[in-house]
């Protein structure tokens, strides 16, 4: 019998990666169809190789994508399908609004240098990837009755892609795309300051494109400071290490900065040492502005309920705190004000 959800009410999720939320069945299907070798030929086998049960380092976790992304990248049908199935997955989890993020370049095989995942050059550009994801998400919205928007990721190791990410955010603004992100390995020294990223973020500020940045996950509080002061981020992806700099943390508390918290992810990537108190406990105690999110459910063998169960069982989170953090997530979403108001009204009504 399925476990009763830790929070059985409508939820808002702001930090989840499309390419980390693919059904193993879909990976197998396209691996077979396209003649691409996968590390296993059953759903269970694939889940065990891609999935994680115990902590690995962030680079080891990122290496998991190498196993299965070649089955999906460069294939129009696969890309539209993973977007559609993502919406179905979230609807089943009781999520009523979700912002899903991905790098258009990592799904393309044309007009992208270098071509990712050792693919041969094809004819699928990053621009068309965004169009396909939009189609899949919009069809999913119609079919499953929830609201979905998307965030396009710049990648820390590829600053040359970032100007195009900004252009795609502008081109597809409100055609599901609501913001820009900076993802990838934040241990790359000085990557927040690479000119490609800085210029793209400056352009986003100028053009009214919303901004979030992965920072302080495994990186130091200094990476968070760079995200806030140089990249002018409006939300912090993860941000756990912010609390190591009291002055910065207190400043961000006062500024009502939103932290996109992914508890189960932080355990499995080693971003959080279980011998210490999790930053989210501090966020709760200080009534900070944060959300709970699943990050990469395929790899973490999880749903968003996994994160709620973890903080409820191990950290004493209450129903009232769950309501508060979801209302904060809605307030910190990148929806236009009128749609944000509608979402909030729905939550207030359902939470009475």
Swiss-Prot record:
Q: What EC number(s) has UniProt assigned to this enzyme?
A: 3.5.4.4
The feature of type site (Important for interaction with adenosine receptors and increasing their affinity for agonists) is located at 58, 62
Example GO molecular function term?
deaminase activity
| Stored InterPro entries | A/AMP_deam_AS (IPR006650), A_deaminase (IPR028893), A_deaminase_dom (IPR001365), Ado/ade_deaminase (IPR006330), Metal_Hydrolase (IPR032466)
Its main localization is membrane
Active site, UniProt feature: 217 (proton donor)
The cross-references to SUPFAM superfamilies, in alphabetical order and at most eight, read:
Metallo-dependent hydrolases
What this protein catalyses is:
adenosine + H2O + H(+) = inosine + NH4(+); 2'-deoxyadenosine + H2O + H(+) = 2'-deoxyinosine + NH4(+); cordycepin + H2O + H(+) = 3'-deoxyinosine + NH4(+)
Positions bound to substrate: 17, 19, 184, 296
Family statement: Belongs to the metallo-dependent hydrolases superfamily. Adenosine and AMP deaminases family.
**Name recorded for this polypeptide:** Adenosine deaminase
The species this protein belongs to is Rattus norvegicus
The beginning of the lineage is:
Eukaryota, Metazoa, Chordata, Craniata, Vertebrata
Underlying gene = Ada
